[in-house]
């Protein structure tokens, strides 16, 4: 099962143009929102998380209860978390495309002498970056989107394409939750099949 789990914040640029903030350097454009982090943990725990190198490098450390697979150029040094942790497995973009489109792949670890099989029975959460999410959407069984709204402008260095969210909205929404975080922040988590 392939599940997309991500969040974004609709905002405006300094020039007044709409944008969908996704990342800010090696962090989150909206800062730490406790409920968002709790929801993310609940949606990804017990799954194999697949992410790009920059997403992995933005993590403080390996997240407990989840395996980490990083899509990267294997000819370069392996990306690590802020604490210097290696991922459980590293794969190429080609292996990622093979997997999400229905194939099986062998994944190997820099820490272990064995290989393991990743197949369609594996519970996988794709968490970003945008290119990985865009590529996986046509094959995703479930999409979990968190929309974080701030009353003020949110700075970002990585944005989502609006057409990506339009494609998600064409799916059936099966669940939605709204949370008032504080006077300037709301969070809406929606699940699509």
Curated annotation (Swiss-Prot):
Gene Ontology biological process: one-carbon metabolic process; response to antibiotic; response to methotrexate; tetrahydrofolate biosynthetic process
Enzyme Commission number(s) of this protein: 1.5.1.3
Catalytic reaction(s) noted: (6S)-5,6,7,8-tetrahydrofolate + NADP(+) = 7,8-dihydrofolate + NADPH + H(+)
GO molecular function (one): dihydrofolate reductase activity
Domain DHFR span(s) in chain numbering: 1-193
Enzyme class name: oxidoreductase
PROSITE patterns: DHFR_1 (PS00075), DHFR_2 (PS51330)
NADP is among the record's keywords: yes
Keywords: Antibiotic resistance, Methotrexate resistance, NADP, One-carbon metabolism, Oxidoreductase, Trimethoprim resistance
Superkingdom as given in the UniProt entry: Viruses
Pathway: Cofactor biosynthesis; tetrahydrofolate biosynthesis; 5,6,7,8-tetrahydrofolate from 7,8-dihydrofolate: step 1/1
Residues noted as binding NADP(+) in the record, renumbered to the chain: 7, 22-27, 52-55, 73-77
Presence of the UniProt keyword Plastid in the record: no
Known function: Key enzyme in folate metabolism. Catalyzes an essential reaction for de novo glycine and purine synthesis, and for DNA precursor synthesis.
Family, as annotated: Belongs to the dihydrofolate reductase family.
Designated name of the protein: Dihydrofolate reductase
Species for this entry: Enterobacteria phage T4
């Amino acid at each position: 099962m392939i599940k997309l789990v991500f969040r974004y914040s609709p905002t405006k640029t300094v020039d007044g143009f709409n944008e969908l903030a996704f990342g800010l350097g090696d962090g989150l454009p909206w800062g730490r929102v406790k409920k968002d982090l709790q929801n993310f943990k609940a949606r990804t725990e017990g799954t194999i998380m697949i992410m790009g190198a920059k997403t992995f490098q933005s993590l403080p450390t390996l997240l407990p209860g989840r395996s980490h697979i990083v899509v990267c150029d294997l000819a370069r040094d392996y990306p690590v978390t802020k604490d210097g942790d290696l991922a459980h497995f590293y794969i190429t973009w080609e292996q990622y495309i093979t997997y999400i489109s229905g194939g099986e792949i062998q994944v190997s670890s820099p820490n272990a002498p064995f290989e393991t099989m990743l197949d369609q029975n594996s519970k996988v959460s794709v968490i970003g970056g945008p290119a990985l999410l865009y590529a996986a959407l046509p094959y995703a069984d479930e999409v979990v989107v968190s929309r974080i709204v701030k009353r003020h402008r949110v700075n970002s260095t990585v944005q989502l394409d609006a057409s990506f969210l339009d494609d998600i909205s064409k799916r059936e929404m099966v669940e939605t939750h709204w949370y008032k975080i504080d006077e300037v922040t709301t969070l809406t988590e929606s699940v699509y099949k």
